[in-house]
A protein has these predicted regions:
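C-terminal and inter-domain tail/linker signature
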Residues: 1-138
């Protein structure tokens, strides 16, 4: 059986970096809960995970996520990552900007029976929109 760290690494490698959204069915529980303040209305389970993937894939096709550091504690993993890409598609109602972005974030997962049961994600949303020239401070 794969370790929790290996499961999450596979989620990054296959789901995010290879755009294999179908892998969510294998890696997430049927009642998976995704806590993302940017997308609070996602359905539970792998379908919600795939919907999140479709949204970001449309806005940042070809983006790459790299994990920089880990904390593994029993049934939980926490990782610090950065994703990079070009905003070449719409993000909700916002049009594509053609701008490059590099955005840091953290992802905390709780595992049950060898699958991701709950996820919390926080990323630098303000920095993301500043890089797209869609937000300013001051």
């Amino acid at each position: 059986m794969a370790s929790n760290k290996e499961i999450f690494q596979r989620y990054i490698d296959e789901f995010w970096n290879q755009d294999r959204l179908d892998v969510a069915d294998e890696l997430h529980t049927d009642d998976h809960v995704y806590h993302d303040p940017n997308l609070p209305e996602l359905p539970r389970g792998p379908e919600g995970v795939k919907e999140r993937g479709r949204i970001y894939k449309a806005a940042l096709p070809g983006r790459v996520t790299a994990i920089h550091d880990w904390v593994v504690n029993g049934e939980k993993t926490l990782c610090f990552w950065t994703y990079e890409g070009v905003n070449s598609g719409p993000l909700g109602e916002l049009p594509a900007t053609g701008k490059n972005v590099a955005v840091p974030g953290m992802h905390l997962c709780h595992y049950r029976d060898g699958r991701i049961a709950e996820s919390w994600v926080m990323w630098d949303r303000l920095g993301f929109f500043e890089q797209l020239n869609l937000a300013t401070i001051g």
